[in-house]
Amino acid sequence: PFFLGCGIYLPHLPWYLPGKYFDMHPLKKIRLPEHRTDDFDDIPEGGKRMASRAGGIIRESGKWREAVQGCLAAASFADACVGHVLDALKRSPYAENTIIVLWGDHGYDVGEKKFAKSALWEQTTRTPLIIHVPAALGGNPAAKTCTRPVSLLDLYPTLIDLCGLPPSQTSSQLDGRSIAALVRNPQVKWPYPAIITHSPHWHGPNHAVRSERFHYIH
């Protein structure tokens, strides 16, 4: 057995990447996200401080469309990098015996709530998460979408569970829980919310609770 942790830097800033990925997203076809000028009128000062100052600068400079293009181009480049890794796996003898987890550490605002991360709103806390378990390991060959809220803290106990490894002596001290049941059946009952904490070094600490229906920010 082997474990490969492959970190792809993009689409994190700076967006330095081959021009062909920008060409995949022509400026004239870029759709800007909805932005309300009064969006922050009903939130406390702490919430306003969370919002990146870059949002106003980018819009005022007239480069909002270019900023969205850069983010899309960087995501396309990262997608191509992931493709190279998956192609190599398919050519290997391990393709049908390897669990694949694709995830991002945070979301990103491109104008909805100003710009960047460093906040607890939906755009910045909702991350990509795809888990593939081969049929030989009990996985479901049909791709399915799960709407249950989960946390990145759940990945470690989930991999332990999916690999059939015994729980460690410290498993009871983990903050996350295995979501293997959701991987096998996305509709299984799941009463647990996702808990998000914003770094105390960035205008915090602040916390959020995300259930399937509600998103509460404190």
Residue ranges: model-predicted function:
Residues 1, 5-149, 162-171, 217-218:
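Active-site-proximal cap/lid insertion segments
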Residues 106-112, 141, 153-156, 161-218:
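C-terminal cap/loop subdomain of S1 sulfatases and analogous C-terminal strand-loop tails that border
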